[in-house]
Amino acid sequence: MKLRELVGAAVSVALLCGMAAEAVAGDRDADAVARGRYLVTISGCNDCHTDGYLQNGGKVPETEWLKGTAVGYQGPWGTTYASNLRLVIGKMSEAQWVAHARKERLPPMPWFNLAKMTDDDLKAVYAYVRSLGPAGVATPAYVAPGGKVNTPYFVFVPVVDQTQAAR
């Protein structure tokens, strides 16, 4: 065999190996995105982070998912807003997201549940949200207790029905 044919064969084998590795990596990425979509769905992320999701029985186009909302959640902690995860995660590395997901948050964010996800689960959520791409605008900033709120908001304060309390 001539040197030219040997070099050509070696280059062809190297290219095929590279393409096979890319295909395997692509399958792994697709699996992570699918797993992340599943986790986002069953964990209820859309309930707060997708505008109109609860009110419409989950019938919101996926292109609108996880953009946050300008409707606040007010309680003794002040007023918080469900962030636009597509913008937040879009600015983070995977490692930054995993660390971010483990931190305590203000109510009503169930951070204690998110923090219990495995690293692989959090990486899958990251892959899914990144696959959606950046979209929307940043949500309003936190308002401390007693501060002026310029958006609609839900009040998270228990109300005691006095007719029931008297019984």
PLM features: residue spans?
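Flexible coil segments in periplasmic/lumen-exposed cytochrome c-class electron-transfer proteins
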Residues: 42, 50-80, 111-167
